[in-house]
Amino acid sequence: MNIFRLINYVLVFALVLTGLVTDYWISTSSLERNGKVLSSSFIHGGLFYGERQLDWGLGPSHQYFSVYDEITQKIGFMNKILWILVIFFIALGLFWSFIGLMISLLNTVAKERKTILGPSGIYLWSLLSICSYSAAIFIYLLQYYSTIQKNVLLPDQLTAGFSSTNRTQLAFSFYLIVAAIGSLFIPMSLLCFSNSIQQRPKTKTIPIDTTVFMY
């Protein structure tokens, strides 16, 4: 059980770190220009970097962009406050998950039953991680439905007739965080199941004295 919890926390840590640094939180597989769908034009972006490929009529043109730079220049599709909050809650969740990972590692070599270094700690750090990652997901969804679905293009690209309205979907980097949240429920569920089994009253066998006879 302890080894499984350790592996699970390593998995959660890997999922969240991968989701944090990869550039596929959102993806637009095709864009419109003056009402015409351009399958060779696309956009994908993460929390830090992204890529735009636009067909201006002379072939596709690649452009890598920094989310931070576009936010500071006030031309990006992310709100600065919401962007900071998303990163903050993911970082906070990683902190709680790291503590949970260390506690799980400790439990593979030591038995701590009634402190936060034992199973109760697994509940605590898992719940704190879930709350932090869920807050990040909620804030990002707020940004997604309020602005990202409407536009992920720059002002000059909009002026040129490009449009990404209702063509942007959540991509795999986002779902890695969702998968990490789901994974955190597994050790908690197993602990609940294990505790329920341990708390069941055990039937005691009463020895029978065969020398005593009832008449």
Model-derived segments and spans:
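Interhelical loop segments of eukaryotic multi-pass membrane proteins
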Residues: 27-41, 147-160, 201-204
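Juxtamembrane loop segments immediately following a transmembrane helix
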Residues: 135-171
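A surface-exposed beta-alpha-beta supersecondary segment
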Residues: 22-85, 162
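Hydrophobic alpha-helical transmembrane segments
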Residues: 54, 86, 90, 164-185
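Alpha-helical membrane-embedding segments
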Residues: 61-72, 154-162, 183-195
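Signature of small four-pass
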Residues: 1-30, 83-143, 180, 184-196
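Non-transmembrane, juxtamembrane loop and terminal tail segments
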Residues: 202-215
